[in-house]
From Swiss-Prot:
GO terms for cellular component: cytosol. Transaldolase is important for the balance of metabolites in the pentose-phosphate pathway. CDD domains: Transaldolase_TalAB. Pathway: Carbohydrate degradation; pentose phosphate pathway; D-glyceraldehyde 3-phosphate and beta-D-fructose 6-phosphate from D-ribose 5-phosphate and D-xylulose 5-phosphate (non-oxidative stage): step 2/3. This is Transaldolase. The gene is tal.
Length: 317
C-alpha cells in the first residue's frame, strides 16, 4: 500500500520543517526550512556541539569586539546547521534573517547578503538557498531588491491576503502562509473549538491564496506551513509545497488512507490588478485582527528565541 506521505509527494513538494538531521534521513524531504526557534532547539542536540564550537571559533577569529562576535557566531551557526541539512536534502534550505530586522529594509538586505556569502564561501550556490524574511511591508520591499540580485526569498509569518498579494507583486520566489497559527487564533477568540479540515480557517486562507496566485498567473511558490494535524495537510494536497514537522511526517508515513488532490486551479489566467500601494497594504492587512496579532506575535517569538540563542553563544565567547 502507498502511504499518505508517498501519495502527497506525487502532487506536492514535501519540505521538512525542522533542524533535526535524523528526521531528514528518515523522511527524505525535497527541501528543509529552519527558523530561530528550530535553530535554538537543534543547538541543544549533542550532534550539534561541533557546529556551535566552529561558529564560536569563526566569530573569535573575525573580530575582537564581543557584540560583533555574537552576531557573527549566530549567523555562522545558522549556516552551519543549514550546511549539514543540505547534505541530506536534494533541494533548498531556508535560513532566516534576524527577526529584529523585520521593519528594517536595508538591515534585512545586508543580513541576507551576509548569510548568502557564508553559504557561498562553503561552496553552496544561491540556487540551494532561500532567505527567510517576515512578511512585513519592509520585509517584502527588501525581498524585492534581493530577488533582483539573484537571492531567492521565502516570505514567512504570512497570515493575510494583503501580505500574499504584496509578495506576489514584489516577485518573491516563495511564500509560507501559516495554517495552524490561524486556527489557534480562531480557537482562542471564539467559542468554536472543533473544525473539520475543509472549514479550518487556516486551510481556507491558504486555499484562497493558492487560487489567487494561479488565477493571476503569479509564479511565486505557495508553501503552506505551521500545521496542527494531518487533516490540515491532506486538505491542502496539491499545494505547490507544504513544510511539515517530523511528528506529522511520521503520521503521514504511517497512514495508508487514500489521498485525493484538493488544490488545482483550472480556470483562465486573468489580467492582474495594479500593484498595491503601501497605504492599501496597511489598510487591508490591518482590517484583519488575526493577521495583525499573529504577525506581531510571530516576530516577537522569533526575536525572543534569537536572544536565548545569543545567551547560549555568549557563554562560549
Amino acid at each position: 500500500m502507498t502511504t499518505q506521505l508517498d501519495a502527497l509527494k506525487q502532487m506536492t513538494v514535501v519540505v521538512a520543517d525542522t533542524g533535526d538531521i535524523e528526521a531528514m534521513k528518515l523522511y527524505k524531504p525535497q527541501d528543509a526550512t529552519t527558523n530561530p526557534s528550530l535553530i535554538l532547539s537543534a543547538s541543544a542536540l549533542p550532534q550539534y556541539v561541533s557546529l556551535i564550537d566552529d561558529a564560536v571559533a569563526y566569530a573569535k577569529a573575525k573580530s575582537s569586539d564581543k557584540a560583533q562576535q555574537l552576531i557573527d557566531a549566530e549567523d555562522k551557526l545558522a549556516v552551519n546547521i543549514g550546511l549539514e541539512i543540505l547534505k541530506l536534502v536534494p533541494g533548498r534550505i531556508s535560513t532566516e534573517v534576524d527577526a529584529r530586522l523585520s521593519y528594517d529594509i536595508q538591515g534585512t538586505i545586508e543580513k541576507a547578503r551576509k548569510i548568502i556569502a557564508l553559504y557561498n564561501e562553503a561552496g553552496v550556490a544561491n540556487d540551494r538557498i532561500l532567505i527567510k524574511v517576515a512578511s512585513t511591508w519592509q520585509g517584502i520591499r527588501a525581498a524585492e531588491v534581493l530577488e533582483k540580485e539573484g537571492i531567492n526569498c521565502n516570505l514567512t509569518l504570512l497570515f493575510s491576503q494583503a501580505q500574499a498579494r504584496a509578495c506576489a507583486e514584489a516577485g518573491v520566489y516563495l511564500i509560507s502562509p501559516f495554517v495552524g497559527r490561524i486556527l489557534d487564533w480562531y480557537k482562542a477568540n471564539s467559542d468554536k473549538q472543533e473544525y473539520a479540515p475543509a472549514e479550518d480557517p487556516g486551510v481556507i486562507s491558504v486555499t484562497q491564496i493558492y487560487n489567487y496566485y494561479k488565477q493571476y498567473g503569479y509564479k511565486t511558490v505557495v508553501m503552506g506551513a505551521s500545521f496542527r494535524n494531518i487533516g490540515e495537510i491532506t486538505e491542502l494536497a496539491g499545494c505547490d509545497r507544504l513544510t511539515i514537522a517530523p511528528p506529522l511526517l511520521k503520521q503521514l508515513q504511517e497512514n495508508e488512507a487514500p489521498l485525493a488532490r484538493k488544490l488545482e486551479y483550472k480556470g483562465e489566467v486573468q489580467t492582474r490588478p495594479a500593484p498595491m500601494t503601501e497605504a492599501e497594504f496597511y489598510w487591508e492587512h490591518n482590517a484583519d485582527p488575526m493577521a495583525v496579532e499573529k504577525l506581531a506575535e510571530g516576530i516577537r517569538k522569533f526575536a525572543a528565541d534569537i536572544e536565548k540563542l545569543e545567551a547560549m553563544l555568549a557563554a562560549k565567547l
